[in-house]
């Protein structure tokens, strides 16, 4: 299923079951507190301008704003997510576009964040070049993602293929992600290879185990989920 079609179909169900922040690893139960930890990890301060690429229904944007940020912009490809975001907060600055075709209108940002959206882009070189070009001098990129385990065995490789079919998402290893951004001259200066140790993943576990209505829509055949939550700060 195409990314746009997937989120047009399922975003309302995600919002109902998991709230406004659709992420596998949560640093705190409430979006405001989760985003405060993200701010610390991404070295974001209230004076910064932030761009959220693949912003969902704006949950992270709202969390950042509740922690004092004023200049937050989001981009999503899903019309359904735009509508749901407007219901959460009519004043959210969310723009509907394929990010690779998005018109930045000359805007530049102190921080650009991608939360579990990096693997949706088919041309990573073009994505990374676009992101880097949108940074202000001294700007940084924060990525929170589901990364493939390194050196997967045959069963794990099969699981990754099943996930690709299900989500149309590429799960890169932490080493691959770090290398890809390094090719654009960006160095990893922060992050954790395994966020499961310091976050709550119970909602995600229930989801992939088929213990929720939304999970049962997704996981009738996936045998293994050889991924881990990781985050990266690139400068």
Regions found by a protein language model. Give the residues of each.
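Class I SAM-dependent methyltransferase SAM/SAH-binding core
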Residues: 57-101
